[in-house]
Amino acid sequence: MSLRYYIKNILFGLYCTLIYIYLITKNSEEYYFLVTDKMLYAIVISTILCPYSKYAIEHIAFNFIKKHFFERRKNLNNAPVAKLNLFMLYNLLCLVLAIPFGLLGLFISIKNN
């Protein structure tokens, strides 16, 4: 994994972390947030490991999905709204599973280099 890939993919994790920190600081009586040190540590660790998680998920998925899958299905880009929703769900999944898959991605990255 290159530094460019890491920086490109850490932006989503940073965005979610900054939203969480903003909501903690602007917390009113309407919202309930888990404001503990352990929760903040988990979010920071997830942010750091989010690109590794995405790398591991892509590495595993592309072992099962071959190039001919995309060549045969030429109408994958005909539904941009569904594609955007799927992309956001994928990024959220990478952030939520960042710690276990991030460690796996870190292992794969070290093994490939």
From Swiss-Prot:
InterPro entries: Microcin (IPR003061)
Biological process annotations from GO: bacteriocin immunity
Keywords assigned: Bacteriocin immunity, Plasmid
Signal peptide segment: none
Lineage summary: Bacteria, Pseudomonadati, Pseudomonadota, Gammaproteobacteria, Enterobacterales
Name recorded for this polypeptide: Colicin-E1 immunity protein
Record's function text: This protein is able to protect a cell, which harbors the plasmid ColE1 encoding colicin E1, against colicin E1.
Organism: Escherichia coli
MF (Gene Ontology): toxic substance binding
